[in-house]
Regions:
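Intrinsically disordered, low-complexity terminal regions
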Residues: 1-236
Length: 236
């Protein structure tokens, strides 16, 4: 009799050892089999962190990547908000008064990301954007004698006011730019590709060259002298 009881107990123990228990708290709870851990990891990957960069003085910017850039005039400052994953391989540095923002080879230039950049400088004389970035300067920007804007790729540019003696704009690709409050002696625009550019303000002289399916709206731009060489469309 004791032998039967011992055998039964051993069998029950073996059965219990082979069972896999799943705890269900309620209809809104997750199963306790690793799902909550993966959800926690995913949420951690989605949470943004803030990095501030002590880069020194700069008056030119070169950005290569899918950034969402907010620019204002003021003391030089660079702040980046992104997930830890998107921060990987990000390089931010100043060389010869030019702020560079770029990724290492481990990251793709135009990969989908959600990287918010907040930057300030006393003046901005040159801006170059490579990739599918967004650049907004709702407070406008101050330039020196000359301002150069170069856009390579499908970036969106919005500048509320821009003042310089000479302004040069060069786009290659499907750029979308809206620049208002222009105050310049000379404005020179060269478009290669399918850019969509809207301009407003005042200039003494304006020269436009389009190669491709570019579309430039200058209906709100006052200019004493206007010349164009176009293989595209200019709305005047």
């Amino acid at each position: 009799m004791k032998r039967i009881a011992v055998i039964s107990l051993l069998a029950a123990t073996a059965l219990l050892g082979s069972c896999r228990f799943v705890t269900i708290k309620d209809s809104e709870s997750s199963l306790s089999k690793g799902v909550s851990a993966s959800e926690t990891t995913r949420k951690a990957d989605e949470e943004k962190i803030v990095n501030r960069y002590d880069v020194g003085e700069f008056d030119s910017v070169v950005c290569s990547g899918a950034f969402d850039i907010n620019y204002n005039s003021g003391s030089c400052e660079v702040k980046v908000e992104a997930t830890e994953r998107d921060m990987e391989g990000l390089k931010v540095y100043v060389e010869d008064r030019t702020l560079h923002m770029e990724f290492t080879k481990k990251n793709l230039l135009g990969k989908k990301s959600d990287i918010d950049v907040y930057m300030r400088s006393d003046t901005l004389n040159s801006l170059e954007i490579n990739g599918a970035a967004e650049f907004d300067s709702h407070g406008g920007l101050k330039a020196g004698k000359q301002f150069n804007l170069t856009v390579n790729g499908a970036s969106d540019i919005e500048i509320d006011s821009l003042e310089a003696e000479f302004i040069r704009i060069n786009t290659n690709g499907a750029a979308d730019a809206k620049i208002a409050g222009i105050n310049a002696s000379e404005l020179n625009i060269q478009v290669n590709g399918a850019a969509d550019i809207r301009l407003a303000g005042k200039t003494v002289s304006t020269q436009i060259e389009i190669n491709g399916a570019g579309d430039i709206d200058t209906s709100h731009l006052q200019s004493e002298s206007f010349s164009k060489r176009v293989n595209g469309r200019v709305v005047r």
